[in-house]
Amino acid sequence: MPARNHTQWMATPPLQKGEWVDSRVYTDQEIFDEELEKIFKKAWVPFRHESELPKAYDFRTTSIANEPIIVTRGPDNEVRAFLNVCPHRGMLIERRPSGSLYEGQPSGNPKRMTCMFHAWQFDMKGNCVYISREKEGYQDRLPKESVGLRRLRCEVKFGGFVWVNLDDNPISLEDWAGEPFQCLRKTLEAEPMEVFHYHKAIVDTNYKLWHDTNCEFYHDFMHYHNRVTGFNDAYFARKNESFEHGHILVGTFEVNYDQYEGFESRAGLSFPHLPPNQWYMIDLFPGMNFNLRGSALRCDVVTPLGPNKVMIEFRGLGLKSDTPEERQTRINHHNSIWGPFGRNLHEDLIGVQGQGTTMRPGQESRRILHGRQENQTIHDENGMRHYYDKWGKWMNRMPSNPELPYNAPAIAAE
């Protein structure tokens, strides 16, 4: 068929409902704001790993759905999460991205979260323990017990990751993610892990476009090393398995690292209960990824910053018991594939940056195809069909026409 005119370009694709989406799901500000309320304020987010809070009074800060969050480790060794907001005048309490509250700061006492604005102080359980000039200003009208921090649901699970949920009554974390994690649970929980690598990317694209790259592998044609070494029968036989809540599991596969130019086999270093050179990938709705590949575990967490902007945080993890030599080997293996200058990750970022360039607020809507059917194997796009079907349910919008309320697609999302 020749190149199309505008009417043909905008026509409904000759596919079934559920095999394509309207690009407004990536570009519309109203839809984005609704996603924060209906999805990100209801979903469990793997905020950090517990190894990033190794000591009592350590803390980390971030945001979820535009809400500032602080996670602390108390003297009782419990990890807790709170809104990083003073209940007095709405001031941000802790401005640092990480640190320790064990020692005093210029604006606060040791072992306290102190709001520098008016010197209100809170302990590691979120209790208000000090109000400056309390009796003079409030007499007996405002007891400290009534102005504690806003606590959040927080659990440490699935290999020591710290999960936070803004909803007071969410689905349990076990029900949320237990089933897709079953394939790796024994491995991840066999012994303590710790983070050895962190970097982040802020990309002008929609967060869902990034997650798409982890839900399908048809784009491996973009990855040079995958294309020249990995396209074999075992690769194409891998299955994409769908789970409740929009999660995806990409089946195991033995990676032949010794076929990569300049690489050698990585069979000498793995994780407990995992055969050498194995590769598992768990994609969690709405945009988190756990990727265990041979000797290194990678975890991605997205923070949507707008319809056309996302922050992606990348962590590499190994075993806490690693010898210095083993740790350096894991770092080298991780960074050669997934580091900022590795042979894989930057190619994915180039791909979604290009999509973000053509799908921006104000541009006309486009039809984005998810219609490949290959018996749910690695180049089937069933992972994306499943994801957007669940997205439609959460949002009560049809992905193929977000102006319409959701109804089940004619084709199964698998």
Curated annotation (Swiss-Prot):
Catalyses which reaction(s): methanesulfonate + NADH + O2 = sulfite + formaldehyde + NAD(+) + H2O
Domain of life per record:
Bacteria
**Keywords associated with the record:** 2Fe-2S, Cytoplasm, Iron, Iron-sulfur, Metal-binding, Monooxygenase, NAD, Oxidoreductase
Phylogenetic lineage: Bacteria, Pseudomonadati, Pseudomonadota, Alphaproteobacteria, Hyphomicrobiales
The organism named in the record is: Methylosulfonomonas methylovora
Instruction: Tell me which GO cellular component terms the UniProt record holds.
Output: cytoplasm
EC number, UniProt record: 1.14.13.111
Q: How is the cofactor bound?
A: Binds 1 [2Fe-2S] cluster per subunit.
Q: Which gene encodes it?
A: msmA
Where is Fe cation annotated to bind? Answer: H225
What switches on its expression? The msmABCD operon is induced by methanesulfonic acid (MSA).
- Please summarize the record's notes on activators and inhibitors of this protein: MSAMO is inhibited by metal chelators (such as bathophenanthroline, bathocuprione, neocuprione, alpha-alpha-dipyridil and sodium EDTA) and by sodium azide, sodium arsenate and potassium cyanide.
Q: Name one GO molecular function term.
A: 2 iron, 2 sulfur cluster binding
Asked if the keyword Iron-sulfur belongs to this entry, the reply reads yes
Rieske domain segment(s): 44-163
Cofactors named for this entry: [2Fe-2S] cluster; Fe cation
Which residue stretches, if any, does this entry annotate as coiled coil?
none
Q: From the Swiss-Prot or TrEMBL record, give the protein name.
A: Methanesulfonate monooxygenase hydroxylase subunit alpha
The primary location reported for this protein is cytoplasm
- UniProt-listed SUPFAM superfamilies: Bet v1-like, ISP domain
Q: Which family does it belong to?
A: Belongs to the bacterial ring-hydroxylating dioxygenase alpha subunit family.
